[in-house]
């Protein structure tokens, strides 16, 4: 066995399918069928890394591995990769002996040998001897062990090597040989000599093509975190590198190394080595082509053909030739019908950074002049481009006007983050423009209000509050009168929005400030004539009083706001007031009245097309249904709210975020976990903002309950945001405590639960019902430890654990008592967890009481499917301990059915453990293949992939079948297994031992 290439460190990510195809190639070679693969991809995308992994695995399988690389030497050194491979492998006795009998190959070795010189390969006889010698060598080696021949970088191969690859691919048939060649697709221009060779080889039945696409963002991020370990990468920094690298592993690693070493001045610079590498391809081209590339780099990520032509200064014929050269060498790629993009964004960055300062300014000024034409400003996004070019060319008035226009365009497109950025830029330029109000068409106060509103709609509430505080202060100064301070309606709007956003910060000080600001806003605005601004200020004041728990005053002012809105003819403000009244009714226990009010508010807001109020109404309406156990109705309302939020770009806005979370929670609670998983999969893992971290924290509910491997990855990404939003940390730490409990790590359970409880106490209202769940999780860990101590006769430890359990029970009881305050509602789920605290305390005391667990079951009710199953597991255990085996078996059976249906693998493992210990339920160790006996071999293959979490399209790709065929197989499998879903089928596969790893989906 020969191992020429060094095995790379670490696990490959993002290349499972490609690796699987190449390993299948090794299987074919090992069984006596000669095969070949052409592995292609851009430079740096991971071809060598993939091939290194294949060679490592081939060596482990007993293959003789020969590996060589081409060099950028043209035809001056024939057979260079073959010589490289043979020189490395000649240390092996078997290879050396096989070479000694083939003098034609001798000259390829360092010590030389008999046979033709390298230069004489042009004669037909010498070529035949060389080709025949290689073929014979491979055949002889393959007789002893399978052979893997790897020839890398064939885009640099000499003509003789290209011909040899074609010859071997055609002549090898039944030899145990696999040939893998790699080449760069970005170097393969139309006249490249390898291009016809690839086309010819791809027609051969024994040759497969493996094209490496760029890594997807998640895979690239995972790869970079592994490369950086044990160092930690800032989430924003990592996201920036992943975005800039566009899936190219080498580029990403270079950016990461420069970032970790502090060599990057900012996120717009490139490491010197990487920049030089990228520019080396540009410097080989004609001067005209380089000028076109410079103009295209300044034009932006997508370069309009006419813009680039005009900016380049070239004549039409010269320009066309230059563009053709750039496209032929795959530096530019046609985009649509009227423009180009760089093959890779970092290439554009390198070309742009290489521009001289004056050259860069002049090109940007040219772009400004060209884009300022009104006809060119028609397509969406053009104003943003113009603003960028104006700034870069120091045209401040032009940049200001374009920024305002770009903000309006972004608003119309439902892109609040971009709108805020443009408006913020305009605000920064305001004092540098001669007549800003005339240029912008609005007062500074209105521009600031637009910026703040879009900041909030993109999820950045804190920045919106900061902007509005400054703006409100500005308008109260003499200079502020010119900024819009004389406009009482504008002042009212700014005060009202500031109060509203302050309440969303969920902080006692912020709420107190909100009440003060809202009260002052209502008092400063004239009641007559009736205006929607004044009516909305009243409605927001009512909402602030509600947040402060001043319920009587809140209802009074909400009714005033409703009357003022009617007088002003503002139905959407009426809806806003109705939402507050609905929340009040719900907190006062009048649930039917609350739902009626909230339904009316939701309808009015939707008819008025005011999305912010509509989403607020949708959230509270769905929550009211959820709290009284109407999960299906709550899910329906939340689903519609989620659709509206995402369709309009308000997914991270106030209530857009909350309604998404509620939509997920409804399906998680009612047992529709495949739907819940789909929603959770849409919650980003690679989070870069607090709102995204909030959603990712919510996804932990199902990831923990299903035992998904995403738990660890989500934790790594959301952890930096725990200090930004304490609530996110509270949710995550509580769920991580449950994850540790399922894994049997009670130390970690107690540590995480303690932090979650502390974070709940730090909430604005102190002791609250949020403490119940983490307290009960910790109580369960204490009960486990007490039981273990009693089993070993350690009475002192058992007593200590019981005392600690008592403290946790008291925390849960205090949380429930606090819920009696009007602000909180302890619905069926809350009562269920409180009852669980009592049952777990009984277990900690050594009395696992079936009646206590039955009380938990009754409290949750049938709507909470998963919690019911978890409770049935404990009830079955208690019944078994009490000797009531038949009842225990029935509870166990129901819980096991639910666990399989949901794909709740940790619960299923706990149930299987109980079945073995208590000998209840149908034994889960089925006879070998008993349940799967009805499946064909192909269906078993498909089921393995289902259990691995693969989609129908992915299954089709792995098994080389059509997606429609994969769909038919999946349907047949579900029918034969009696499974209601893919998740249930995956659980069966795992239980039956067909899958060694549970599905992540």
PLM segments and residue spans:
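Conserved Walker-type P-loop NTP-binding/catalytic site
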Residues: 2, 80-148, 199-202, 206, ...
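Internal alpha-solenoid helical repeat scaffolds
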Residues: 59, 235, 270, 382, ...
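Short secondary-structure boundary elements
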Residues: 45, 84, 215, 219-421, ...
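Helix-turn-helix DNA-binding segment
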Residues: 916, 923-980, 984-987, 991-1001
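Extended alpha-helical scaffolding segments used for macromolecular assembly and cargo binding
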Residues: 36, 50-54, 250, 302, ...
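Alpha-helical sensor/transducer elements of the RecA-like P-loop NTPase core
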Residues: 126-129, 173-240, 244, 254, ...
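Alpha-solenoid helical repeat architecture
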Residues: 33-34, 77, 337, 377-383, ...
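Tandem amphipathic alpha-helical repeat scaffolds
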Residues: 38, 44, 183, 261, ...
